[in-house]
Amino acid sequence: VHLSGEEKSAVTSLWGKVKVDEVGGEALGRLLVVYPWTQRFFDSFGDLSSASAVMGNAKVKAHGKKVLDSFSEGLQHLDSLKGTFAKLSELHCDKLHVDPENFRLLGNVLVVVLARHFGKEFTPQLQAAYQKVVAGVATALAHKYH
């Protein structure tokens, strides 16, 4: 991901304030509600029958935290995302058969959740930087599909 020094420091500065468990659960929950076809990858998560069931689901929250823990790792290796996410890309491609488009969708949902949590602090410039990051992560996760 090609970020200026200013963009990198803005991204990492904001990320230091992110409550990974809260934001991760909300982002994954919103993905499952807004794009219901993504629920097919989470059959073992129990009740996903309504928006409130999804958003209150402990397994959704736990997996959302796990996803953002990996994202946090990626933020420390912005210049080598493909290597950082190689194993996860392989897992999602070969074993889980996740449509790689879902990574892009989740990245965009994450940006929405960050905007919701940080309000005016999440400036258009910061959004632009985060869009670059989530696009880079989505591309890295889709790498093994090609």
Curated annotation (Swiss-Prot):
GO terms for cellular component: blood microparticle; haptoglobin-hemoglobin complex; hemoglobin complex. This is Hemoglobin subunit beta. InterPro entries: Globin, Globin-like_sf, Globin/Proto, Hemoglobin_b, Hemoglobin_oxygen_transport. Heterotetramer of two alpha chains and two beta chains. Involved in oxygen transport from the lung to the various peripheral tissues. The modification Phosphoserine is found at residue 44. The modification N-acetylvaline is found at residue 1. The modification S-nitrosocysteine is found at residue 93.
